[in-house]
């Protein structure tokens, strides 16, 4: 007998992106997991972020953004696994998502970033992107993050020591 699946139980494809950061792994981990209300500006987005909880092993935050057809809300629980990985589970009114992030040192002092995620849309007419379009959009965002991170790293290295 074929097992029935509901719309609620379906997940889409697994998405993947890989980016290199011109910073050491410890700096990349600290930078990537330092969730702040200012993160939207790095993405060129307009959502508002509220940090609900922050401990050495977990960050919980909520994002809220107005759209043409109402509010987009999500709550993300990020489990930190220092020194090089973290896991995120997000629930929202339009989609749920699970993601795994892994950093690996590269021989030249740089860091490789690997992101794998799955999302489950909850709204049938939500903006549909192909797998390639979604991965390309995410890659662009992480390249912007990489540029900001590398600038922050250079700035931190120029600070005078006392």
Regions found by a protein language model. Give the residues of each.
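A conserved amphipathic terminal alpha-helix motif
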Residues: 118-162
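Hydrophobic pocket/interface hotspot
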Residues: 28-32, 38, 61, 77, ...
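A general secondary-structure signal for short beta-strands and their flanking turns/coil
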Residues: 10-16, 58, 96, 108-112
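Hydrophobic-ligand binding "helix-grip"
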Residues: 66-112, 118-120
């Amino acid at each position: 007998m074929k097992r029935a699946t509901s719309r609620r139980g379906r997940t889409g494809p697994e998405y993947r992106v890989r980016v290199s950061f011109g910073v050491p792994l410890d700096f990349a981990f600290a930078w990537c997991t330092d969730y702040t209300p200012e993160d939207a500006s790095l993405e060129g987005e307009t959502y508002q972020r509220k940090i609900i909880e922050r401990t050495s092993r977990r960050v919980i935050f909520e994002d809220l953004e107005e759209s043409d057809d109402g509010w987009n809300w999500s709550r993300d629980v990020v489990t930190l696994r220092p020194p090089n990985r973290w896991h995120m589970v997000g629930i929202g009114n339009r989609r749920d998502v699970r993601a795994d992030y892994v950093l690996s040192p590269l021989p030249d002092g740089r860091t490789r970033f690997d992101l794998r995620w799955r999302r489950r849309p909850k709204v049938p007419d939500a903006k549909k992107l192909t797998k390639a379009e979604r991965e390309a959009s995410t890659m662009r965002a992480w390249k912007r993050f990489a540029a900001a991170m590398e600038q922050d790293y250079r700035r931190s290295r120029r600070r005078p020591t006392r």
